[in-house]
Amino acid sequence: MGIRAIVVDTAGTTTDLNFIQDVLFPYSVKALPDFLEQNQHNVLVENCICDTKDIALEPEADLARVTEILQQWVNEDRKATPLKTLQGLIWKQGYAHGEFKGHIFPDFIEAVKRFSTQNLRIYSFSSGSVDAQKLLFSHSDGGDLTEMFNGHFDTRTGNKLDKQAYCNILNTISLSPKQVLFVSDVIEELKAADAAGMMTCQMVRDSKQRTGDFRKISSFDELQIE
């Protein structure tokens, strides 16, 4: 049967975690107050504000309080969908203004080109929104990589720690579990993918990283698909 598709995690796998934590997250925290003030009547932003109030159980929260809640969620690394949607919108402005470029590990840039020539389908699965993933890969320091991808998945597909999210991905891409390889640095994500029947591989870029009973690589250079 063989592997026909590869699903990659982003932070810690294709992208340096420090870029997310030290560049993207602080940028969104700083930009949130002005962004919400200027765009609060945009339908998408308005929906995110309402969803934030619902999740926080604060239906009467004013805009300042909503901003405070969202900034707190960033600091807690909460995977709440309204936060991730707003971050994607904010980062879109940052990329457009040249504030930063998306960091992608060079070995992944080379590997994704190699996988494309092997007719392997490539997908990304991240807690960041699909739009944020597209921005990361289209404004990467290795150029625009979006044409190399067949699709992207985010929290709307499910929690990355839940088996069902990976079952949903399999249903969407219409492949059997053993035809799909999931690559991530996070043990709990790999366990969930394994429970869904997917093939798995742990990316270990840091020697201090927690490792589990999975096939391991330290670079995409080591990932050979026959």
Curated annotation (Swiss-Prot):
Reactions accelerated catalytically: 5-methylsulfanyl-2,3-dioxopentyl phosphate + H2O = 1,2-dihydroxy-5-(methylsulfanyl)pent-1-en-3-one + phosphate
Keyword annotations: Amino-acid biosynthesis, Hydrolase, Magnesium, Metal-binding, Methionine biosynthesis
Enzyme Commission number(s) of this protein: 3.1.3.77
InterPro entries: Enolase-ppase_E1, HAD-like_sf, HAD-SF_hydro_IA, HAD_sf
A Gene Ontology molecular function term of the record: 2-hydroxy-3-keto-5-methylthiopentenyl-1-phosphate phosphatase activity
Any Pfam family: Hydrolase
UniProt pathway: Amino-acid biosynthesis; L-methionine biosynthesis via salvage pathway; L-methionine from S-methyl-5-thio-alpha-D-ribose 1-phosphate: step 3/6; Amino-acid biosynthesis; L-methionine biosynthesis via salvage pathway; L-methionine from S-methyl-5-thio-alpha-D-ribose 1-phosphate: step 4/6
GO biological process: L-methionine salvage from methylthioadenosine
Superkingdom: Bacteria
UniProt-listed Gene3D superfamilies: 1.10.720.60, HAD superfamily/HAD-like
Names of required cofactors: Mg(2+)
Cofactor note text: Binds 1 Mg(2+) ion per subunit.
Function: Bifunctional enzyme that catalyzes the enolization of 2,3-diketo-5-methylthiopentyl-1-phosphate (DK-MTP-1-P) into the intermediate 2-hydroxy-3-keto-5-methylthiopentenyl-1-phosphate (HK-MTPenyl-1-P), which is then dephosphorylated to form the acireductone 1,2-dihydroxy-3-keto-5-methylthiopentene (DHK-MTPene).
Assembly and oligomerization: Monomer.
Family under the similarity heading: Belongs to the HAD-like hydrolase superfamily. MasA/MtnC family.
Cited PANTHER family: ENOLASE-PHOSPHATASE E1
NCBIfam families recorded: enolase-ppase, HAD-SF-IA-v1
Name of the molecule in the record: Enolase-phosphatase E1
Organism in which the protein naturally occurs: Shewanella putrefaciens (strain CN-32 / ATCC BAA-453)
